[in-house]
């Protein structure tokens, strides 16, 4: 982080969920250590993953020849949500019917059980929890949460 280069070390940096990406935390020499951010799911690092998460990780690595990152997990989870809504829409797939089907998702858990989402006509953000993370040793570590909002 540029702030460390200019010795601006007495300031804590808190970012949005957009920075919750493994490539951010994994910058060499711990340059991102100390960064804080919020996000609605906890990335399953392989060494701390449960059996289901490891099976998914191994399959991803077998298919793509590299370890999954947060983008991979988001893609997997978001695709699962969309596929479930399409199934619930039925044969008459229109935008309006798809939206109505999305609104039937209540406490819907993704296959890895990392997060659950709910939608209705007044709730469009899906999740209502966040975890507070700090980059430590080039990985995101939960320091608080889940926090309801």
Each predicted region: which residue ranges?
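Electropositive phosphate-/nucleotide-binding environments in soluble metabolic enzymes
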Residues: 50, 54, 76, 80, ...
